[in-house]
Amino acid sequence: MNKPTPAIVSQDAARRLPRWALLLFCLAYAVPGLVGRAPWKSADLASFGYMLEMARGQTSWMDPRLLGLRPEADGLLPYWLGAAAIRLGDGWLAPAMAARLPFFVLLGLAMAATWYAVYLLARKPQAQPVAFAFGGEARPSDYARAIADGGLLALIACLGLAQLAHEITTSVAQLAFTALAFYGAAGIGRRRWWPEIGLLLGLAGLALSGAPTISAFLGAGAAVLHVLATARPWRKGDWRVLGIIALATLLAILLSSSMDLWRWRILLPQDAGSKDWRTILRLLVWFTWPAWPLVMWSLWRWRLQVWSRTPSLHVALPLWFMLVTLVAALTTKPADRALLLALPAMATVAAFALPTLTRSVAALIDWFTLLFFTGCGAIIWIIWIAMQTGYPRQGASNVQRQAPDFVASFSLPVFLVALVATLVWGWLVHWRVGRHRAAIWKSMVLPAGGAALCWLLLMSLWMPLLDYVRSYSVVVRNVMAIAHPAQCIQQWGLSREQVAAFAYHGGYRISQATPDQLECPWLVVNPEALAGLQVQASAGQWQLLATLRRPSDKGDDVMLLRRTSP
C-alpha cells in the first residue's frame, strides 16, 4: 500500500523548463574552465603529467610513472582517456586542451545521467503527487520532467562541484560513472535496456577509475533496495532485475581484482586524530550548499516513504548512494573528492523537496541566493576593476600582495562575455520575482544561475590572475631564463606536479638524480629535500643560483643549482 504523498502539484506547476534554457545553464557552467587556462596545482597538473607522458610514449599505459613515481590516485581509465585525447589531437590541439575534452564529456554525462535518474524516480507511483478530487493534478510525465529539471539545477548550484568538476582527474570520472550507475539503478526493469547498460558501464567505470569499494557497495545496496521495495520480490521480472544488478556488481569486482585496484584507504579509529572533524563539518556545509538543507527538508517530508517496510525507491535509492559516498568522505582522504560523488544523489533528494516547500521557505532561498551571488559577482567585478585601474586601492593592494609581479591585461571579448553573463543574471532575478511563480523548479533557478554566473566571471575576468597564482608557469619561465631546456638537468625531491610543470611549460626532459648519479650541470631541488642531497653529495660541488617560489604559496619553493666542479 502506498503511503500518503506530501507532494501537492497542479498541472500548471509541472511546467517544464525550456530545453534551450536548461542547455544554456549546463553550457554556461561546463564550458568556462575548459579553455584558456593552464593545468593547475596540484592533482590537475599531476594527472596531466601522466597523460602527457603516456601520449608521448615515455611511460607504460598499464603502469604509468613520472620519474619512477606512480599516480597517487588508483584507476587507469581517466589517464587512458586523457592520453588518447592528447594523441588524437596532436598537431591541431594543445595538449592541455585536448586532455580536457574527454573530461568535459564526462561532466556532461554526469549532468545528463542525473537528470534521467531523477526523471525515472519521479515517474514511480510512490513519488507521484496527490490526485485532486476534481482533476487538475500534474500528469506523471510532466511532473517527473519538472522534478528532473529541479534536480539538475540543484546539482549545478552545489558550490563544491565547480572546481573539482573542471579538473582532469579521476574525481571527474568517478562523478560521471557514479551518476551513470545511479541512473541505471533508478531505471532498471523498464522495457528499454538503456538503464541496464548504464548500470553495467557505471559500476565498471567507477571501479576502473579508482573507486572499486564504492562501486561494490553501491551495486549491492541497489540490489537490496530493489528487493525491499517490491511487495512480491520473487516474481520473474524482479528476479531479472536482481540478476542484472548482481551481474554488474560482480563484473566490477572482477575488473577491480584483475587490475589489482583493491587498496586499504580507510582511516581506523586510532587514526581519527589525523582528520580535523571541524574542517570536515565546514566542508560538508559549504561543499553541498544549497542541496543539504533541502535534503533535510525532503527526508522529513517523505519520512513515511523512507521508513516504510517497503521503502520507496525515489528517496531510498539516492539516500543509499548519498550515505555510501558520505561515509567514504568521512573515512578516507581527501574528503572533498569523495564528497563530490554524493552530489548527484543529494541533488535528487533535494529535488523531491521542491513540491513540498512552503512559500516562506521558497522566499528565504530566493532572497539568500540573490544577496549571496549578487555580492559575490560584485566582488569579482570590483577586484577586476582594481586590477585594471588601481582603484579601489584596497582591492589593488590585495592583488599586489598575493601576486606581486602580476600585470593585468584587458581583453574585450572576455569583458563582453562577463558583461553579458551579468546582464543575464539581472534578467533571471527580474524573471524570478515577476512571473512563473507556479513552477516547482523555480526555487533552484537563482541558486543554479548564481553558481554559473560566479564561475563564469572567475573563469573570464580573473583567469589571468588565477593562472598566475595556481600554475607553475611563472616558476618554469624563471628557470628557463637561466637554464635552457636543451641542457641536461636533474631533479631531487620534486613533486609529481612540479615534474609535470617542467615538462609541459618548459619542455624539459628532467631525469631523476641518485646518490651515485649527479652527472648533469643543472639540478632542481625541493628545499625540503636539500638536507638529503647534502648527505649524499658534496655540497661544495654546487652553487645555488636562485630560489624560485610560486606567487601564492610560500611553502612551494624550487631551488636551482649549478655544478661548480666536476
Predicted features along the sequence, with ranges:
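Transmembrane-helix motifs of polytopic, lipid-linked glycan transferases
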Residues: 101-139, 156-157, 180
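Extracytosolic helix-loop segments that constitute the early lumenal/periplasmic catalytic or substrate-binding loops
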Residues: 47-73, 77, 84-87
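Membrane-embedded architecture of ER/inner-membrane glycosylation machinery
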Residues: 3-23, 171, 187-566
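Short acidic/glycine- and proline-prone juxtamembrane loop motifs at membrane-interface regions
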Residues: 160-173, 212-214
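Hydrophobic/aromatic residues in alpha-helical transmembrane segments
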Residues: 114-117, 161, 181, 295, ...
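Loop-to-helix entry region of an early transmembrane alpha helix in multi-pass inner-membrane enzymes
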Residues: 76, 80, 89-117, 141-149, ...
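Intrinsically disordered, low-complexity acidic Ser/Thr-rich regulatory segments
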Residues: 135-154, 462
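Aromatic-rich transmembrane-lumenal/periplasmic boundary elements in polytopic membrane proteins
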Residues: 27-61, 262-271
